[in-house]
Amino acid sequence: MKLSFLSLALAIIFVTVLIYAPQAEAKALADAVADADADADAAADAVADALADADAFKIPWGKIKDFVTGGIKEVAKG
């Protein structure tokens, strides 16, 4: 008797999955498109903010390069 209840429960789950899978897939695709649009907007905003911040703050690339190359030379010695 337990086997028949288990079979019935599995059959109900299987049928439910078959019925609702296309709806869930369509919703997931629509959500993915909306998420991609939102991510693109967020990325564009982040780039614009980074460029604005870079203009406002002058980065001493020469000093950074000297620091990094000096560290690499010390590691190579050691």
Swiss-Prot record:
Q: Does the keyword Secreted apply?
A: yes
**Annotated positions of the Lysine amide modification:** K77
* Tissues where this protein is expressed: Expressed by the venom gland.
InterPro entries (alphabetical): Pilosulin
Please report which protein family the annotation says this sequence is part of: Belongs to the formicidae venom precursor-01 superfamily.
What does the UniProt record say this protein does? Peptide with toxicity towards insects that may also act as antimicrobial peptide. Causes calcium influx in F11 cells (EC(50)=5.8 nM), possibly by modulating sodium channels (Nav). In vivo, is lethal to insects, but does not show toxicity to vertebrates. Intraplantar injection into mice does not induce spontaneous nocifensive behaviors up to a dose of 200 pmol.
Any idea what this protein is called? Myrmicitoxin-Ta2a
Q: Which organism is it from?
A: Tetramorium africanum
